[in-house]
Every structure is written in structure tokens, then in C-alpha cells.
Swiss-Prot record:
It comes from the Bacteria. This is 5'-methylthioadenosine/S-adenosylhomocysteine nucleosidase. Homodimer. It catalyses: S-adenosyl-L-homocysteine + H2O = S-(5-deoxy-D-ribos-5-yl)-L-homocysteine + adenine; S-methyl-5'-thioadenosine + H2O = 5-(methylsulfanyl)-D-ribose + adenine; 5'-deoxyadenosine + H2O = 5-deoxy-D-ribose + adenine. It is an enzyme of class 3 (hydrolase). GO terms for cellular component: cytosol. The keyword Amino-acid biosynthesis applies. Belongs to the PNP/UDP phosphorylase family. MtnN subfamily. The active site is at residues 12, 197. Substrate binds at residues 78, 152, 173-174.
Amino acid sequence: MKIGIIGAMEEEVTLLRDKIDNRQTITLGGCEIYTGQLNGTEVALLKSGIGKVAAALGATLLLEHSKPDVIINTGSAGGLASTLKVGDIVVSDEARYHDADVTAFGYEYGQLPGCPAGFKADDKLIAAAESCIRELNLNAVRGLIVSGDAFINGSVGLAKIRHNFPDAVAVEMEATAIAHVCYNFNVPFVVVRAISDVADQQSHLSFDEFLAVAAKQSTLMVETLVQKLAHG
């Protein structure tokens, strides 16, 4: 099995990259792909860049170049669920765009023409992630993750997301674009991210302060998940 891993930022991939043995690096379309073995398992780690277009481009390049069997999207996220705090884990059961609106033509809010309203994560990957969470004794929430090209740092944007997606547990800027590409390629995916901030008017301050905490936690989760997927 070859496992694809996608993170947007240098801070979100550096700890995993340093753990890859026999590492080789290739740059495609402004994205960096690192291939090798993570604890003996073949992996391809992509640093995509921030935002939906960068994430979709990166996911496509990773799937075409490295041909992984599954995709894990890692990194940080803003917490929406009331039980979440910095360092906690969110696992997707579905991903949706929070900034797409074609409702004038009868689509659900967040749905694009020709696409489902949401992109479902793979049940086996979800189960494996939840098993890792239990083993590591981490606080985690599973649910809807929403994505858009905005860092949510104010009451207006937050209120809009809560209104349109009351069940959303986290918000970030890449996951749904990655899920969209995986849907088109028919490749299983799951989003496993750590909370860097609670989406509110001070979230930019929290993000800067706690990104390293989120990166450490998400790296731990992904490393454990890769082992579980490789060895059952």
C-alpha cells in the first residue's frame, strides 16, 4: 500500500517529512512531493500551499505522479464544535465548501453543479483514525469539516458558517478541495487535523501561537494511522 499525505503549510509537513527514510523530493506545479518510507510504509507527502486551488492542484499532481491508494489530509483547523480545544483532533465524515453558493439554481448551499452536496470520507479510513485516537487517548470529534478561501477571524464569517452548516465541527481552507479531487479520481480519503484555534475574533492570534502544537498532534495521528493502515 502507498499512502498519500497532504498538508498545506511548511509547518504542517516538516515533522512528517523529517521522518521519511530514503526521501526523494520532486517539485511539480509549485508543489513539493516527498516520497520514501515512513516506518517502513511507502508514502508520498505533498506540501500543497494554502487555499482550495492550491490544494486541488496539489492533490491532482500527487494522484497522477505518485498514484497513492488512499489520501490523508493533515494539518491544522479552526474548531467549531464546543468541546474542541487547541491540540484536539477532528476527523471528517464529510467535507463541504462553505463559500460556494449556487442556490439560485436549486442546489444546496455549498454544492457545486455536477457534484454531490458533500464529499464523504471513506468508512474504513474513518474507523482506522478513530482506532488510533483511542490508542493515543486523544480528545477528538468526528463530523463535517467545511472549507473556503478565508481565514475565519470575525463574528460575521463565523455566524454565516454556523447558520449554513450548524453541524460543522471544524473549518479550514483545503480539505474539501482535496476531497473533491479524490471523489473525481475515486480514491478513498479522510481528513485528520488538529485544532490550532477556535474560530472567533481572536483566532488569528491563537493560530500563530498554537500552530506548532497542532502540527505536533496531527503528525502523531498521521504517523499512527499510516502504521495501522499498513499493518491492519
